Amino acid sequence: ALTFHYLCSTNYKLRTVMETLEKIFAAKLLKVKAIKLQPTNPFTWASGWKSPFYCDNRKTLSYPELRNFVKIEIGRLIAERFPEADAIAGVATGAIPQGALVADLLNLPFVYVRSKPKDHGLENLIEGELRPGMKVVVVEDLISTGGSSLKAVEAIRNNGCEVSGMVAAYTYGFDVAAQAFKAANVKLITLTNYEAVVAEAVRIGYIDPSDVEVLNEWRKDPAHWNG
């Protein structure tokens, strides 16, 4: 196995490492049923969207080996891509545990960003201490449209800090998210993605190759897909 220290100190070709990581993590997510694919029996998301695809990265917290894998790989990516980082910020609530684990690994300060300020006490939006001028890397568990993730970025910037980038466990790869991150000038890196998960699901026989067309049609226009 490639260790955190080894990957950070060698001249491995980054693209090869990332492609391998995407496949490995996709397989791990499918194994623990953190990702479910139901082309003929779609889920309903909180947004009201119908979807044949559901990802729950919080399940990884219940498996020590997988939890450690996520911590090490996100930590490695931050150490490689954002060595200037002064602090780690987790997006509430899904990325709070992952972000805290990564911050501990890298020996960096940790904060988390709420979706809205508390309605009592200090009414904080950011919990923890960030000093103006700090360079912050945001940790997220999942990227769909990118809206909530980029609100966290905005809150950190409004605190006088610089957001170096964001590392997420998974992305659906929606065009709307790519456009939003580009407009906000935020570099996004993920452990795995839609393409890697679907390819692995077909390889292990979790879905039929014929299901891929349904999944791809949904991904093109998720807001209007009805199954």
What are these regions (language model features)?
Residues 5-143, 147-227:
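PRPP-associated nucleotide enzymes
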